[in-house]
Design a protein with these regions (language model features):
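Conserved N-terminal beta1-alpha1 strand-loop-helix module at the mouth
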Residues: 1-205
Length: 205
């Protein structure tokens, strides 16, 4: 079984981006939607320059397609994460217009069924945000995510992950990747180097 990849999201500075990549993060996420961690495209471009070897993920919520295209061009974003109510047709168009893979996020308490996921025919990855607090995601939702992963979908697991629970979450689901934001922060948008290093070590354990 391949190790789970790691996405560190909510990066707001080139320094934190470089630290995440130095510790082994595969994906660096920048939030371009309304959020305490939101940054503008110019800042995203600076982060891109700081980590040229990493995969940069731009996070959007119900965006205009032109805004996605501009962000991809300006900040050289590698993957488009859609965190709102985007329909399959929008995901298709985002891929067609940018050439960048799409990560579609589902935030509901119930993980969507296979038929719903299958409608996203050109979507490369699905991210399941299974919990909003700092506890390990509920067992039933972990079971659902694991079942979907076994069907061949490439799954990012997110929600409530931190250094204290990520090892168990990975063991329960064997996701393609884990996604952490708040669980490795000292304050919104500021990463805690110690927590970040511990998180990476637990994923690799």
């Amino acid at each position: 079984m391949n190790r789970a990849r790691v996405k560190i999201c909510g990066i707001t500075t080139p320094v934190d981006a470089a630290l995440a990549v130095a510790l082994g993060a595969d994906f660096v996420g920048v939030i371009l939607a309304e959020s305490p961690r939101r940054i503008d495209i110019a800042r995203a471009a600076l982060i891109r320059a700081a980590v040229p070897s990493a995969l940069l993920v731009g996070v959007f919520r119900d965006p205009a397609l032109d805004d996605v295209i501009e962000a991809v061009r300006t900040a050289d974003i590698d993957l488009i994460q859609l965190h709102g109510h985007e329909r399959p047709a929008f995901c298709d168009e985002a891929l067609a217009r940018t050439g960048r893979p799409v990560i579609k996020v589902f935030n509901s308490n119930t993980v969507p069924g296979v038929a719903q996921l299958a409608a996203y025919t050109t979507t490369s990855y699905f991210l399941f945000d299974t919990n909003k607090d700092d506890s390990i995601p509920p067992p039933r939702r972990l079971h659902d995510v694991a079942a979907i992963r076994r069907m061949g979908f490439r799954v990012f697991l997110a929600g409530g992950l931190n250094p204290g629970n990520v090892r168990d979450a990975v063991a329960a689901t064997h996701p393609f990747a884990v996604d952490v934001c708040r669980g490795v922060e000292s304050s919104p948008g500021v990463k805690d180097p110690v927590a970040l290093e511990r998180f990476m070590a637990e994923v690799r354990a």
